[in-house]
Amino acid sequence: MVTRRRLHHPEVEQVSKRQKVDKAESKNKKHADVAAERGEQSTEDHEDESQDKKDKKVVGDNRDEDEEVSPNGQEAAEDNDDRKDKDAKEKDTETNDEGTEKSHTDVNDDDDDVDESKEEDAAAAVDITKEKKDEQESDNKTEEKKVQENEEEEEEDENKNDEDVEELGSTEPVDDEKKGLVKFEFDGVEYKFKERASVIEENEGKIEFRVVSNDNTRENMMVLTGLKNIFQKQLPKMPKEYIARLVYDRSHLSMAVIRKPLTVVGGITYKPFNKRQFAEIVFCAISSTEQVRGYGAHLMNHLKDYVRNTSDIRYFLTYADNYAIGYFKKQGFTKDITLDKKVWMGYIKDYEGGTLMQCSMLPRIRYLDAAKILLLQEAALRRKIRTISKSHVVHPGLECFNDIENIKPIDPMSIPGLKEAGWTPEMDELAQRPKRGPHYAAIQNILVELQNHAAAWPFLRPVNKEEVPDYYEFIKEPMDLSTMELKLENNKYEKMEEFIYDARLVCNNCRLYNGENTSYYKYANRLEKFFNNKVKEIPEYSHLID
């Protein structure tokens, strides 16, 4: 009974309900807002049902009291009092029973709330799991979509590259521009030539060629400093102070290759002698990382056009070291100095170990268009050949060699076009003979080594009779390295012994004419020692050296 009364107390019941409702709400809020709303709705429904039961019970009690109370007589009053006492006892009993029933109902309701809360928690957990699963599936779909997009982009890039390759292999004008090809027509025939990378970059505005001097302007001084740094790096044997002095000398000019905005790639420093119509190229260098793009040749062409158009200079002179001789030869320089010595002797610096080279500029040639001019000359020559020869006619190939099992010799004169080309049986015999002897390659290598040796500069060319008038009175069999090179090209050396004889003759003549204390005598000894060592390195000719 105590338990029933305690459960029947309305405040205890209300606190218990609120605690359970709060607990259910806190759980539901952690899982999902939907579960919380369901829990609140369930709690409100239970409270409404309990309140409806209380209201119905109170209304029933009031009706009973109204029916039992009567206004007539004392007996009625006593009976009424007795009934009131009896009704009060019955009411207490009913109230207790009702409280017991209500307490059982509340307990059942609480159990239902707990069960519903658990069910709602489970439902919320299922919803959260479902949401996570949906999010994961969405992420997977997004990743798959990204991967698919990347694959599509890669395929597009590959297709684009394939299209570019196909375009480069075609003959459309746009593709020729991509490859740097320049087209023009001559006599209705289309000709093409490929521009250097440096020319393409200049046309695109990536590089420029600028003439600068020491005029104290900030930008020109920056360019000169960049040139000085390149010269000092590319010409390590030159004293750095000497390079700086000449680059900043106000009597010198420089043409620089500049990658925009202001990065010096290379250049040429030269000293003009306008009254004597020549200029001395003092330094010429391109940065080591940029030498494969044709900057050197394009720079020299720019310099030739600039000097010829702005002055009376018609010749270039320079002392080239062993590594620069090949470059200067390609740019039109030669070792044969045709310019009178009275014009340049004493005006340019003589470098020990360097080779003096000269370039004579043609007045009617624009060197930047030299490639196109040469191609036009070739086209004109081919046109002339077509008027006197049928060499441009292409005959079908021979079919007699298709059957390999039944090959038979044929008369060369029966081959279409062979006779018209001027072929004779004697020409076949000459063609089968070896052009060079077995010793040609060895002689050529040794001769190149001799010409590039530091002590060879006095022996590169024949002695000038004007400079040394009595030389040929003492030396009856003169010899020099350029004469040996000419004899080699004309197949005059039939044996290695003949080449060795001429090489020793060069040194013997020098020692015969010059005294032992002269530098020329020492140069001859050094060069002969170097020559003997080179021949000994070749096993088949080492026995020829004593």
Curated annotation (Swiss-Prot):
It is found in: Nucleus. Residues 108-119, 150-175 have a biased composition (Acidic residues). The record marks E280 as: Important for catalytic activity. Residues 1-176 are annotated as: Disordered. One of its GO terms (biological process) is negative regulation of induction of conjugation with cellular fusion. Acetyl-CoA binds at C284, A285, I286, Q291, V292, R293, G294, Y295, G296, A297, Y323, A324, I325, G326. The active site is at E280 (proton donor/acceptor). The keyword Translocase does not apply. Its EC number is 2.3.1.48, 2.3.1.-. Residues 207-362 form the N-acetyltransferase domain. Residues 434-538 form the Bromo domain. It comes from the Eukaryota. Signal peptide: none annotated. One of its GO terms (cellular component) is nucleus. InterPro entries: Acyl_CoA_acyltransferase (IPR016181), Bromodomain (IPR001487), Bromodomain-like_sf (IPR036427), Bromodomain_CS (IPR018359), GCN5 (IPR037800), GNAT_dom (IPR000182). Residues 9-44, 51-62, 81-107, 128-149 have a biased composition (Basic and acidic residues). It holds the Pfam family Bromodomain. One of its GO terms (molecular function) is histone crotonyltransferase activity. The keyword Nucleus applies. It catalyses: L-lysyl-[protein] + acetyl-CoA = N(6)-acetyl-L-lysyl-[protein] + CoA + H(+); (2E)-butenoyl-CoA + L-lysyl-[protein] = N(6)-(2E)-butenoyl-L-lysyl-[protein] + CoA + H(+). It is an enzyme of class 2 (transferase). Keywords: Activator, Acyltransferase, Bromodomain, Chromatin regulator, Nucleus, Transcription, Transcription regulation, Transferase. Belongs to the acetyltransferase family. GCN5 subfamily. This is Histone acetyltransferase GCN5. It comes from Candida glabrata (strain ATCC 2001 / BCRC 20586 / JCM 3761 / NBRC 0622 / NRRL Y-65 / CBS 138).
